[in-house]
Amino acid sequence: MSEKQTFADKKRKTVEQAEFTEDGRYLRKVRSFVLRTGRLSDYQRDMMNNNWANLGLDYQNTPFNFEQIFGNNNPVVLEIGFGMGRSLVEMAKQNPDRNYIGIEVHTPGVGACIAYALEKGVKNLRVICHDATEILRDAIADGSLGGLQLYFPDPWQKAKHHKRRIVQPEFITRVLTKLGDNGFIHFATDWENYAEHMLEVLRQFDKELRNTSATNDFIPRPDFRPLTKFEERAHRLGHGVWDLYFVKQA
């Protein structure tokens, strides 16, 4: 590859918008992710460069027009942190009556997801390489989502890093404004402490959200959620896996 940077190479450097204080100082943010230095393969780079117009969406500070993007009014499900994207593509393939948007900040995963979507002939999927909190804040219209999926997010195990966990009350508040009536929130994690944290946060919204668990905590592993590599690793390590499924009350 030449030293000239392509679209895919530049994408990694623009996963969040720079923000400044009123006096012009750079505003440091508490991020729920760390940009790993995994190598973007030539194949993944080509997938992004050649197919972004059809399968990719760029950050914008106005809401996406989903009907224009997908050509229909089917419900839109947003997945945050899709990793390499195989489970997201499989879910989109299994549910042609839904549209899916996946957000991932790591370009190798974005390239791999695009490649797998092309292999499977999936048309009802778009990917975004940007900070999910900024996408939710700026590019998703209120009441426009049919559901939000967050599978195996970084657990930030150390107590001093718990503030970096994406599942916080302010995050749920934002998500609630973006969900339509009866929209769902589906979380999964293989860290028990994070599962308990998620449940504690979601329970703060018991007037807005209904827990579908018969025991008012976690649901059995649903068949509709494809197995991810993180879940496979969890099983190998003897970890449990916890699913939470809440529905916005009309």
Curated annotation (Swiss-Prot):
InterPro entries: SAM-dependent_MTases_sf, tRNA_(Gua-N-7)_MeTrfase_Trmb, tRNA_methyltr_TrmB_bact. S-adenosyl-L-methionine binds at E79, E104, D131, D154. Substrate binds at K158, D190, T228, K229, F230, E231. The active site is at D154. One of its GO terms (cellular component) is tRNA methyltransferase complex. One of its GO terms (molecular function) is tRNA (guanine(46)-N7)-methyltransferase activity. Pathway: tRNA modification; N(7)-methylguanine-tRNA biosynthesis. Gene3D superfamilies: Vaccinia Virus protein VP39. Catalyzes the formation of N(7)-methylguanine at position 46 (m7G46) in tRNA. Belongs to the class I-like SAM-binding methyltransferase superfamily. TrmB family. PANTHER family: 3-DEOXY-D-MANNO-OCTULOSONIC-ACID TRANSFERASE/TRNA GUANINE-N 7 - -METHYLTRANSFERASE, PENTACOTRIPEPTIDE-REPEAT REGION OF PRORP DOMAIN-CONTAINING PROTEIN. This is tRNA (guanine-N(7)-)-methyltransferase. The lineage of its organism: Bacteria, Pseudomonadati, Pseudomonadota, Gammaproteobacteria, Pasteurellales. The gene is trmB.
